[in-house]
């Protein structure tokens, strides 16, 4: 449950 959060953050920041 750490990659999903990272992917979401990256997509939101990008």
Swiss-Prot record:
Tissue note: Expressed by the skin glands.
Cross-referenced InterPro entries: Bombesin (IPR000874)
Keywords associated with the record: Amidation, Amphibian defense peptide, Pyrrolidone carboxylic acid, Secreted
Residues annotated with Pyrrolidone carboxylic acid modification: 1
Compartment list: Secreted
GO BP terms in the entry: defense response; neuropeptide signaling pathway
Cellular component terms (Gene Ontology): extracellular region
Residues annotated with Methionine amide modification: 14
Family listed: Belongs to the bombesin/neuromedin-B/ranatensin family.
Name of the featured protein: Alytesin
Organism of origin: Alytes obstetricans
Lineage: Eukaryota, Metazoa, Chordata, Craniata, Vertebrata
């Amino acid at each position: 449950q750490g990659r999903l959060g990272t992917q979401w953050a990256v997509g939101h920041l990008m």
